[in-house]
Amino acid sequence: MAVPKRKMSRANTRMRRSQWKAQAPKLVKTVENGKVSYSLPHQAKLVSDSAGTPLFYEYKGRKVADA
């Protein structure tokens, strides 16, 4: 296993770590009943009635779980 010969300075350590970036999530735009919503892909969607009461979860057009 490689071992550093000298201690890395704070400035160099922080400079190296500043390159670590989190990627923004890729959202999918869906239009339902005239409302636009954004969600993560490959996740079950909550289906609700007109009053806003949650009914069930849906994935790829199939019911997968009760709400």
Swiss-Prot record:
InterPro entries reported in the protein's UniProt record: Ribosomal_bL32, Ribosomal_zn-bd
Region entry Disordered, spans: 1-22
Gene Ontology MF terms in the entry: structural constituent of ribosome
Taxonomy, superkingdom: Bacteria
Gene Ontology cellular-component annotations: large ribosomal subunit
Biased composition (Basic residues): 1-19
Pfam families: Ribosomal_L32p
An example Gene Ontology biological process: translation
Keywords of the record: Ribonucleoprotein, Ribosomal protein
NCBIfam families: rpmF_bact (TIGR01031)
Family according to the record: Belongs to the bacterial ribosomal protein bL32 family.
Name this polypeptide is given: Large ribosomal subunit protein bL32
UniProt organism field: Kocuria rhizophila (strain ATCC 9341 / DSM 348 / NBRC 103217 / DC2201)
Encoding gene per record: rpmF
